[in-house]
Design a protein with these regions (language model features):
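Short, aromatic-enriched amphipathic alpha-helices that serve as compact interaction elements
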Residues: 3-21, 29
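A solvent-exposed, acidic/Ser-Thr-rich amphipathic alpha-helical stretch
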Residues: 4, 23-73, 83, 96-97
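Hydrophobic/aromatic beta-strand elements that line small-molecule binding cavities or substrate pockets
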Residues: 14, 65-71, 86, 101-107
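Short beta-strand segments enriched in hydrophobic/aromatic residues
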Residues: 30, 84-86, 119-122
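A short, structured loop/turn motif at beta-sheet edges
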Residues: 71-78, 106-112
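A short hydrophobic beta-strand element
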Residues: 75-88
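Short, cysteine-centered beta-strand-loop-beta hairpins and adjacent loop/turn segments enriched
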Residues: 87-96
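Short beta-strand edge/turn micro-motifs at domain boundaries
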Residues: 99-123
Length: 123
């Protein structure tokens, strides 16, 4: 598998794990220091995000991939932009579908890629 294929696979695995509430998969593919910057600007640490998925404060109901673009790989660092239609209930709100754009950052550690940072916006 090429580096490009590996980071695309990680992006897709994260989206699948969010919907399936596969917390062990999220823990495995996210760096311990991973931060998720939400559309509101709130910067959320990895374990808080996973906890909110576990407790249904953030319920991801579906995620439909529309585009992956701007893939950049430099040695052991990489990034991409993924665009998905995400249906979710967030922090007590109703069910909504967002055109969610994620700027994803990756690092290669011990020969394996891991997600290090994410920034959410809409497209």
């Amino acid at each position: 598998m090429t580096d490009q294929e590996a980071i695309i696979q990680l992006y897709r695995e994260e989206n699948e794990a969010m919907v399936a509430k596969n917390l062990s998969k999220l823990n495995q593919i996210l760096a311990p220091t991973m931060k998720l910057t939400h559309m509101t600007g709130y910067v959320q640490p990895k374990l808080e995000w996973i906890d909110q998925i576990q407790n249904d404060e953030m319920q991801y109901l579906s995620s439909k991939e529309e585009n992956i673009k701007d893939i950049e790989i430099y040695d052991n660092q990489a990034s991409l932009i993924g665009q998905n239609q995400v249906q979710a209930k967030i922090w007590g709100g109703g069910v909504n579908t967002w055109p969610l754009q994620m700027k994803m950052y990756f690092a290669k550690q011990n020969g394996n890629w891991i997600i290090t940072n994410q920034v959410a916006s809409t497209y």
